From Swiss-Prot:
<keyword id="KW-0689">Ribosomal protein</keyword>
<dbReference type="GO" id="GO:0019843">
    <property type="term" value="F:rRNA binding"/>
</dbReference>
<keyword id="KW-0694">RNA-binding</keyword>
<protein>
    <recommendedName>
        <fullName>Small ribosomal subunit protein uS17</fullName>
    </recommendedName>
</protein>
<dbReference type="InterPro" id="IPR012340">
    <property type="entry name" value="NA-bd_OB-fold"/>
</dbReference>
<dbReference type="GO" id="GO:0003735">
    <property type="term" value="F:structural constituent of ribosome"/>
</dbReference>
<dbReference type="InterPro" id="IPR019984">
    <property type="entry name" value="Ribosomal_uS17_bact/chlr"/>
</dbReference>
<comment type="similarity">
    <text>Belongs to the universal ribosomal protein uS17 family.</text>
</comment>
<comment type="subunit">
    <text>Part of the 30S ribosomal subunit.</text>
</comment>
<dbReference type="InterPro" id="IPR000266">
    <property type="entry name" value="Ribosomal_uS17"/>
</dbReference>
<dbReference type="GO" id="GO:0022627">
    <property type="term" value="C:cytosolic small ribosomal subunit"/>
</dbReference>
<comment type="function">
    <text>One of the primary rRNA binding proteins, it binds specifically to the 5'-end of 16S ribosomal RNA.</text>
</comment>
<keyword id="KW-0687">Ribonucleoprotein</keyword>
<dbReference type="GO" id="GO:0006412">
    <property type="term" value="P:translation"/>
</dbReference>
<dbReference type="Pfam" id="PF00366">
    <property type="entry name" value="Ribosomal_S17"/>
</dbReference>
<keyword id="KW-0699">rRNA-binding</keyword>
């Protein structure tokens, strides 16, 4: 099973080798059918202390490092930090691109039917 990969923003880099990452996601409310933003904070391992507050990072699931830390930073502002998880990042990027392409295709089909 592939590891989960999330993209978020670093909100705190005050701990040694640990950053707090805020991951936003959008869901549809089941009753009102309105998009709602939900967010969650994850503690992620940053081996080289390279991440700073405000950086956009990708984190990947890993075996537990501590009680709260089960994620590792592998990508920061367009640069890969850990080559050990490169295949997980590539798989997630392919999955995201495929989802975006199918979403665009569905929007085009809906537009075509409406015209």
């Amino acid at each position: 099973m592939p590891r989960r990969v999330l993209t978020g923003r670093v909100t705190s880099d005050k701990m040694d080798k640990t950053v707090t990452v805020l991951v936003d996601r959008r869901i549809i409310h089941p009753l009102y059918k309105k998009f709602i933003r939900k967010s969650k904070k994850y503690a992620a391992h940053d081996e080289a202390n390279e991440c700073r507050e405000g950086d956009i990072v990708r984190i990947v699931e890993c075996p537990p490092i501590s009680k709260r830390k089960t994620w590792e930073v592998v990508w920061r502002n367009g640069h890969v930090l850990s080559t050990a998880h490169k295949e997980a990042i590539d798989a997630a990027a392919t999955q995201i691109a495929h989802a975006e392409a199918s979403g665009e295709a569905a929007a085009a089909a809906a537009e075509h039917q409406g015209a």
